[in-house]
């Protein structure tokens, strides 16, 4: 398992568009991945769970990935979370 703390740079936080991008990215890997925000564990494959998470720009989250391509999954998901160009 690999883990990284990330500061979310998506300007409007995780709403439907970035949630879809995160989910699509996560589903492109065999590794299981999740985002830890406070006491919440969010499955990155679930758009609804991501939207409901209440994660805003500037929040610090942990991304955890476990599986055969865990490092690539971690890089992919964190790059989306750190992308400040994703708009509404």
Language-model segments: which ranges?
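C-terminal structural segments of small proteins and small subunits
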Residues: 54-88
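Compact, glycine-rich, soluble single-domain proteins
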Residues: 7-53, 57
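Intrinsic-disorder/low-complexity, polar/charged segments enriched in Ser/Thr/Lys/Arg/Asp/Glu/Gln
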Residues: 1-5, 60-62
């Amino acid at each position: 398992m690999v883990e990284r703390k990330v500061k979310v740079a998506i300007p409007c936080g995780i709403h439907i568009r970035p949630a879809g991008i995160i989910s699509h990215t996560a589903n492109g890997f065999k590794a299981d991945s999740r985002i830890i925000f406070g006491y919440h564990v969010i499955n990155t494959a679930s758009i609804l769970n991501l939207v409901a998470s209440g994660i805003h720009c500037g929040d610090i989250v942990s991304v955890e990935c476990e599986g055969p391509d865990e490092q690539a999954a971690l890089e992919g998901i964190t790059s989306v979370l750190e992308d400040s160009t994703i708009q509404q």
